[in-house]
Amino acid sequence: RTSAAAELIEKVKFSAVKGNISEIKALMGVSAQTKGVDAAEGDSGSADDAAELAKSFSKKTGAITVITGKVDIITDGKRVFKIYNGAPLMKSVTGTGCMLSALLGAFLAANKENMLEAAAAAVCMMGICGEKALARMKKEDGNSSYRNYIIDAVYNFSEIDMEAAKYEL
C-alpha cells in the first residue's frame, strides 16, 4: 500500500494528502511503525514535530498535508493550522478517516482559492462532529452508536456549529 501511494504521489499532483503520522512518515521514507491504517504509538511525538514533518511533506509534494491525530495538523508548507477538536473515541470507529476524506474533497472543491483554510475547516468540522456525537452517548452505547451519531452530526451540521472550532494558526 505504501509503495502504491508513493508512486501515485510521484506521478500525480494532488491538492491534499491526508494520513496519520505513521502514514506520512512512511511516505517521507522516515522509519515508521504503521499498523494497517492506524498510527503506531511509537510514531506519535509532539504536535510541533508533526507540523515540521507535514511542512516537509508539503514542500516535497506541493500538496496540502493533513496529519490526523490527537492534534490535527494542516499545512501548505508555510502556514500551519493545529486543530484541537475531536474525541478519543473517534479512533475506535472504522471509517472516520474516510468520512474526513469525503469532507476534505468537498471543501477543497468548493474553495479552490483558499484551499488551506478549506482543509482546516473540513478537519474542524469532523472534529466538532466527533465531539457532538460523544455528547450524545449514553452508558449503554457502543462504537456503532457513536459512528451513527457522527453521521447524524455531519448531516445536521450548520454554520453556527463551526463556532466550536478550536485551532491555532
Language-model features, listed with the residues they occupy:
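Conserved phosphate/ATP/ADP-binding segment of small-molecule kinases
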Residues: 2-80
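Charged C-terminal helix
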Residues: 128-169
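Short pre-catalytic strand/loop immediately N-terminal to key active-site residues, enriched for Gly-Thr
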Residues: 81-94
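A generic structural signal for secondary-structure junctions
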Residues: 29-32, 123, 155
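Short, flexible coil/turn micro-motifs enriched in small/turn-prone residues
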Residues: 64, 90-92, 100
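Electropositive phosphate-/nucleotide-binding environments in soluble metabolic enzymes
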Residues: 2, 18-21, 47-51, 98, ...
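Short, small-residue alpha-helix embedded
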Residues: 26, 94-124
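Short, well-structured alpha-helical segments that form the helix of a local strand-helix-strand
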Residues: 53-58, 115-129, 150-151
